[in-house]
């Protein structure tokens, strides 16, 4: 994780996912972590980041419209990416679909829970590219 200096976390604005995003930040003490509600996300947030975490509580939240648009037209060259959600398969499939064109190194293990108990290991695995 030493080469990862800046991490971008984008969530859909729900209270539970905002709490997960804040907890995620605590597990990245060696990096600068920027947390954005999807409605506040801009394309310029992506390029300076060395790693990404994207989370939504249900598929296709309105707050992710700009994130979806930008990820379709950018190559992020294998940078690490973790996906988190409160819901099961539909949200996971949605999140995977929006990152597929960006050439990110997505952690296959998605964090599906509002619980932050096992978050540290998942964050480490994601940032190490496992």
Residue ranges of each PLM-predicted region?
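FMN-binding flavodoxin-like domain, especially the glycine-rich phosphate-binding loop
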Residues: 2-10, 15-38, 43, 48-130
């Amino acid at each position: 994780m030493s080469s990862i200096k800046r991490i971008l976390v984008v969530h859909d604005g729900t209270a539970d996912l905002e709490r997960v995003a804040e907890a995620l930040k605590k597990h990245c003490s060696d990096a600068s972590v920027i947390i954005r509600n999807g409605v506040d996300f801009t394309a310029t947030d992506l390029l300076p980041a060395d790693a990404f975490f994207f989370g939504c509580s249900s598929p296709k939240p309105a707050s992710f419209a700009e994130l979806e648009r930008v990820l379709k037209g950018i190559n992020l060259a294998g940078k690490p990416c973790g996906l988190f959600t409160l819901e099961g398969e539909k949200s996971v499939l949605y999140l995977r679909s929006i990152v597929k064109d960006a050439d990110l190194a997505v952690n296959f293990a998605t964090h599906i829970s509002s619980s932050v108990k096992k978050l540290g290991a998942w964050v480490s695995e994601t940032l190490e590219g496992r």
